[in-house]
Amino acid sequence: MTIKVSIDASGGDYGISVTIKAGIKALDVFQDLYLYFVGDESSIKAELNKHLSNTFSSRYTIIHASEVVLMNESPAIALRKKKDSSMRVAINLVKTLKVNACVSAGNTGALMAISRFVLRTIKGIDRPAIMGRMPTMIGHTHMLDLGANVDSKPEALIEFATMGSIAVKHIENIVSPTIGLLNIGEEDMKGSEKIKKTAELLKASNLNYVGFVEGDDIYKGTVNLIVCDGFEGNIALKASEGVVLMMGYYLKQAFTRNLLTKLVALIATPVLRDFKSSLNPGKYNGASLLGLQGIVVKSHGSANVDSFLAAITEAYVEAHAKISDKISLQISKELEHNE
C-alpha cells in the first residue's frame, strides 16, 4: 500500500529550505511513500531542482498555495481569511482522502483550528489533544495533552487517555499500554479535585491505569503513556527541552576550559555523540493531533531537516497503522456499549 502524505512546505520558521530536503530524505527512506508538497510552486520547484535527481520524480506532486500562515498569526484570521494557505490546502487533501496524513511545522494554534474546522472531530470526542514522545532512560514514553487544551475537565482527560492508549497500542505494538496520570505526588490524597476525579474515572475504566506519576517519572519510563492537561504538558515539554540545552551548554563549557579538557573531550567523542543523540529533542519531533477524522502531525516550528524528517516518519507510521480509524472504531464501540 502506498502511503500518501501532504507537506505544508511553506510552514515553520524555515519553510521550504527545510521541508523539501526532509521530504527528499523521506522518499529515500520509505519506498512506499508518496508526497504532496504544498506551497509556492515556483519556490518548491527551485528547491527541488537543487537537491533532487530524477529518481523520485514519479513519487511527488507539487500543489500551489498562494498564502502562508505566519508563526505569530491569529488562528481565527488564519482560519477565516487564508483559505489558500499552504497549511489549509495540505489539510484539505486529508479531507478529500487524496492523502493519508498531513505534516506541518506551522503555527500550532492555527493548525489546530484549521484541522478541527476542515476534518472535524471523531464522533464522541469533544476536543482533540496533542500527543508526542518524550525521551526516557529506557527509550521513550508518550504524553498528552501537550498544549491543545489548557483547562481540561476530568471527562476530557479520560478521552485523552482513551485516544492515547489506542494510538500507543498500534504505534508501539503494545497490547495494553500502561497509563499514568501526571500529579504532584503518588499518594491518593495529593493533587487537585480535578486530578482526583480523573483518577477515579480512570480506575473505573477498562484502560490499563497504574496510578499517579510525578514529573521525574516522565524520564524514567515508568509508563507507556502519561496523561495530563495541556497546560502542564506543554510546560513539561518545554522544560525538558530547556534542560537539554542547558546540559549541552555546560558540557561544552567544561570540555573547552583548557587543553586537558579538550583532550578528554576528544577521547570521549563517541560517548558524547551517543549522549547528544539520545537527548536530542529533534529525534522525537512530530506530535499527533489525536481525535480528528484524519491524521495531522505537528512538527516543531524551528525543526531542522532531520527533525522534520522525524515528523514525516511519525505521519508515515500513523498512516500505516490507520490510527485515526482505529480511534474512531473504538470510540464508536464504547458509545454503542453505553447506550
Curated annotation (Swiss-Prot):
SUPFAM superfamilies linked to this entry: Isocitrate/Isopropylmalate dehydrogenase-like
Lineage: Bacteria, Pseudomonadati, Pseudomonadota, Gammaproteobacteria, Candidatus Pseudothioglobaceae
Source species: Ruthia magnifica subsp. Calyptogena magnifica
A molecular-function term among this protein's GO annotations: phosphate:acyl-[acyl carrier protein] acyltransferase activity
Main location: cytoplasm
Protein name stated in the entry: Phosphate acyltransferase
Record-stated family: Belongs to the PlsX family.
Subunit: Homodimer. Probably interacts with PlsY.
One GO biological process term: phospholipid biosynthetic process
Signal peptide start-end: none
Pathway membership, UniProt: Lipid metabolism; phospholipid metabolism
Reported function: Catalyzes the reversible formation of acyl-phosphate (acyl-PO(4)) from acyl-[acyl-carrier-protein] (acyl-ACP). This enzyme utilizes acyl-ACP as fatty acyl donor, but not acyl-CoA.
Subcellular location, record wording: Cytoplasm
Any one cellular-component term (Gene Ontology): cytoplasm
Keywords (A to Z) from UniProt: Cytoplasm, Lipid biosynthesis, Lipid metabolism, Phospholipid biosynthesis, Phospholipid metabolism, Transferase
PANTHER family: FATTY ACID/PHOSPHOLIPID SYNTHESIS PROTEIN PLSX, PHOSPHATE ACYLTRANSFERASE
NCBIfam families reported for this sequence: plsX
The EC number(s) this enzyme carries: 2.3.1.274
InterPro entries (alphabetical): FA_synthesis, Phospholipid_synth_PlsX-like
Domain of life: Bacteria
Keyword Lipid biosynthesis applies: yes
